């Protein structure tokens, strides 16, 4: 099978060459069950990669990143047979835990003890199923795909430099992301993974990008201990104990001055 290589520059993706593929010997990428490789549709049961990543970290293996149903390891020339054997052993242990539907307290003791009230009585398959069903309900894989397709790119009303100047001059306000529809972002918004800017300063919050970040916010509240790293979007706990996403946007007054009207 062949694929294409893409170079990404903010919101511009161009194919380098058709029928060209490249394998990076320093990257070891695994996929976890949950998405049909032929149809691209969600299966009935899945194992979100973040759960496997948490298990590996609790057992001395640190993945570079995990996202939905893929997990990435970075290899170096210093990796030896013992390290690779340890990785394989831990993945096989996790598989056995899933097959046996072991108690979550046994599979992920550190995470379980940190969030015992939330996960009390859970088994590993229950957690996998619940998280998989959540991703399926919000169709997060298609949201992630849409964010990097030209027809779904956010509308740009200022160039990134202008928006950054407004941020430095503090012509901004911090708003709940749930109320950011139509507001001009002044910081680059980036979830890691994938580690690529989804909203560039000067672009308007909305569409797939906003829906994706709101899905992440909901996931953070539903599954404590599995929060992704976010840049340009800030998570703070409100008075009810809910984790709320916030973002800096251009003030309405400054929008009117720069654009002739508030968006």
PLM feature spans:
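Non-catalytic terminal extensions of PLP-dependent enzymes
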Residues: 1, 8-263
């Amino acid at each position: 099978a062949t694929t294409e290589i893409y170079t990404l520059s903010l919101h511009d993706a161009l194919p380098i060459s058709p029928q060209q593929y490249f394998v990076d010997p320093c990257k070891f990428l695994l996929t976890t069950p949950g998405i049909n490789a032929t149809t691209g549709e969600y299966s009935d049961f899945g194992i979100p990669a973040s759960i496997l990543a948490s298990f590996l970290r609790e057992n001395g293996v640190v993945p570079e990143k995990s996202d939905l149903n893929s997990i990435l390891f970075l290899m170096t020339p210093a990796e030896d047979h013992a390290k690779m054997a340890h990785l394989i052993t831990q993945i096989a242990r996790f598989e056995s835990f899933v097959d046996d539907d072991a108690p979550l307290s046994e599979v992920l003791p550190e995470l379980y003890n940190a969030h015992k009230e939330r996960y009390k009585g859970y088994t590993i398959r229950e957690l996998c199923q619940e998280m998989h069903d959540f991703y399926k309900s919000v169709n997060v894989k298609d949201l992630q795909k849409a964010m990097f397709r030209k027809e779904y790119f956010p509308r740009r009303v200022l160039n990134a430099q202008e928006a950054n100047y407004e941020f430095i001059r503090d012509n901004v306000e911090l708003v709940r992301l749930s109320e950011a529809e139509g507001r001009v972002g002044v910081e680059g918004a980036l979830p890691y993974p994938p580690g690529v800017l989804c909203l560039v300063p000067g672009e308007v919050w909305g569409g797939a990008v906003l829906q994706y970040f709101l899905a992440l916010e909901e996931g953070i509240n539903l599954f404590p201990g599995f929060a992704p790293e976010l840049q340009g979007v800030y998570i703070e706990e409100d008075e009810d104990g809910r984790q709320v996403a916030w973002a800096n946007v251009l003030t309405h007054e400054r929008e009117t001055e720069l654009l002739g009207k508030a968006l």
